[in-house]
Amino acid sequence: QNETNKKCQGGSCASVCRRVIGVAAGKCINGRCVCYP
């Protein structure tokens, strides 16, 4: 998993994860986007 410092408030992390790891897979944990390659 790849934890980012991008805050997420009930929104999707897909766009963030697509930028970070190239795959729109992730979820919001403790207010941060965590991406799963």
Swiss-Prot record:
It is found in: Secreted. Keywords: Disulfide bond, Ion channel impairing toxin, Neurotoxin, Potassium channel impairing toxin, Pyrrolidone carboxylic acid, Secreted, Toxin, Voltage-gated potassium channel impairing toxin. The record marks 6, 18-19 as: Hot spot basic residue in hERG blocking currents. Has the structural arrangement of an alpha-helix connected to a beta-sheet by disulfide bonds (CSalpha/beta). One of its GO terms (molecular function) is potassium channel regulator activity. Expressed by the venom gland. This is Potassium channel toxin alpha-KTx 15.1. Belongs to the short scorpion toxin superfamily. Potassium channel inhibitor family. Alpha-KTx 15 subfamily. The record marks 36 as: Aromatic residue of the functional dyad. The modification Pyrrolidone carboxylic acid is found at residue 1. InterPro entries: Scorpion_toxin-like_sf, Scorpion_toxinS_K_inh. The record marks 27 as: Basic residue of the functional dyad. Blocker of voltage-gated potassium channels (600 nM of the toxin induces a block of 25% of hERG currents). May also inhibit Kv4/KCND when coexpressed with DPP6 or DPP10. In adult rat brain, it blocks the transient potassium channels in cerebellum granular cells. Blocks potassium channels by a simple 'plugging mechanism', in which a single toxin molecule finds a specific receptor site in the external vestibule of the potassium channel and thereby occludes the outer entry to the potassium conducting pore. Disulfide bonds join 8-28, 13-33, 17-35. One of its GO terms (cellular component) is extracellular region.
